[in-house]
């Protein structure tokens, strides 16, 4: 996963930094002091709630073409990320478990 959250002091999600989009800065140490997290972050394509059902998660990933999306609680606090890879792995496991019953 190459996406990292940017939060405030209360853990509210402000944005994300996608390392694949800032490679030019990462490999040039002389630029490190010239940028802040606020300058490098961007709004994620969507935010998911911990209350969102899997159907909403899958639809949101399809609609936004995102492989990684942040998850927040009902106060807007960052909880974690969900990835398409993890989602599909969980789905496959459910299908295996279901077929064994």
Predicted ranges, named:
Residues 5-7, 16:
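Short, conserved beta-strand edge motifs with alternating hydrophobic and charged residues
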Residues 13-67, 74-101:
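Tandem CBS (Bateman) regulatory domains
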């Amino acid at each position: 996963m190459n996406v990292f959250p940017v939060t405030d002091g209360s853990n509210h999600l402000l944005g994300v930094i996608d390392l694949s989009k800032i490679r030019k800065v990462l490999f040039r140490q002389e630029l490190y002091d010239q940028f802040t997290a606020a300058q490098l972050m961007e709004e994620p394509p969507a935010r998911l709630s911990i209350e969102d059902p899997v159907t909403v998660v899958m639809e949101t990933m399809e609609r936004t073409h995102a492989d990684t999306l942040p998850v927040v609680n009902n106060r807007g606090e960052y909880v974690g990320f969900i990835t398409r890879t993890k989602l599909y792995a969980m789905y496959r496991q459910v299908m295996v478990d279901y077929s064994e019953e």
